[in-house]
Amino acid sequence: MPLPDTMFCAQQIHIPPELPDILKQFTKAAIRTQPADVLQWSAGYFSALSRGDPLPVKDRMEMPTATQKTDTGLTPGLLKVLHKQCHHKQYVELTDLEQKWKNLCLPKEKFKALLQLDPCENRIKWINFLALGCSMLGGSLNTALKHLCEILTDDPEGGPARIPFKTFSYVYRYLANLDSDVSSSETESYLASLKENIDTRRNGMIGLSDFFFPKRNLLENRENSEDVGH
């Protein structure tokens, strides 16, 4: 025999006073993050909130640059969210990392494809995973390092995006080692030239202006030099 429905009076229903603010912050977070699957993302959001973990929330809205059907779905903003959630650990368990990836509504097959670049068993060094994610965002090694600087920097958005040269050189060597077209001698020569340029004026830090030169600027410089030659 089914049990009768339990009835509660208004005095028995306790609504925590902080609930309106929680829902307000949740709504703002959803608007900024624009998750592809709201239910999946919401589960990850409130799970992290209940544990006191960093939330899967972007710092700001992003213009979409890819679709999950044709590309990774990964964006600089989402990769930065993962970094906020994982950077306090030197190594991250793959099961935990995959769940965080899933909570950001990123395709599982792309997670596996990323790990195939540098296979591991149960865990991965976080800085290595971050480097692989940056390489997935950028077509070239320098573009990947640009994304790395923008994610790791303490400078305000739009600033020089400086990070320690030690971190930069580690990631550059790591990614270059995965690229069969880049020799170790080329890597070391390039890093040595960068270090020489920044040692006297950057206090061990490297920023975008030290290594990243957009194609547009290169073309303008080339045109200017040709004009001078004429």
From Swiss-Prot:
Keywords: Cell projection, Cilium, Flagellum, Ubl conjugation. GO terms for biological process: flagellated sperm motility; regulation of protein phosphorylation; sperm capacitation. GO terms for cellular component: motile cilium; radial spoke. Sumoylated, sumoylation decreases upon spermatozoa capacitation conditions. Residues 17-54 form the RIIa domain. It comes from the Eukaryota. It is found in: Cell projection, Cilium, Flagellum; Cell projection, Cilium. Functions as part of axonemal radial spoke complexes that play an important part in the motility of sperm and cilia. Important for male fertility. With ROPN1, involved in fibrous sheath integrity and sperm motility, plays a role in PKA-dependent signaling processes required for spermatozoa capacitation. Component of the axonemal radial spoke complex 1 (RS1), at least composed of spoke head proteins RSPH1, RSPH3, RSPH9 and the cilia-specific component RSPH4A or sperm-specific component RSPH6A, spoke stalk proteins RSPH14, DNAJB13, DYDC1, ROPN1L and NME5, and the anchor protein IQUB. May interact with AKAP3. Interacts with FSCB; the interaction increases upon spermatozoa capacitation conditions. Interacts with CFAP61. Belongs to the ropporin family. This is Ropporin-1-like protein. It comes from Macaca fascicularis. The gene is ROPN1L.
